[in-house]
């Protein structure tokens, strides 16, 4: 535990791999100065359904963690015409063994939906300040035209349900 507080805290690629993400998030909150900014990256439940399907296939096929098996899996996916395979090919993580291993074989992964994030923010006493991606925000604003819509997690949840891959990149 740090005995220091910060104006800005960024956490990417960590909380969703912890045994208890909420406990980790709570610790980060204690390190945030009042009025500070916390930027958190989490995996989207909806946007990672293609990865869930591929993990099920990996389990069914008994594919292991060695480089040869992972390369063979990658070849199978590249040659496939399945929609969930075509989605993963778009990920930069698909093209490096270490990042593909992390993407498909990580032993622990928690995925989040927006209502759960909203609940966590409320429980932690944090305020949602918006999403960072200009591209995503720009698309959202086409159907959510009021300024306050940008900070309305219920509207974001509806938007994500209509666009399930919007948060595919953490």
Where would I find each of the regions flagged by the language model?
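Rossmann-like AdoMet/SAM-dependent catalytic core
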Residues: 70-170
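A short beta-strand submotif of the Rossmann-like class I SAM-dependent methyltransferase core
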Residues: 11-14, 40
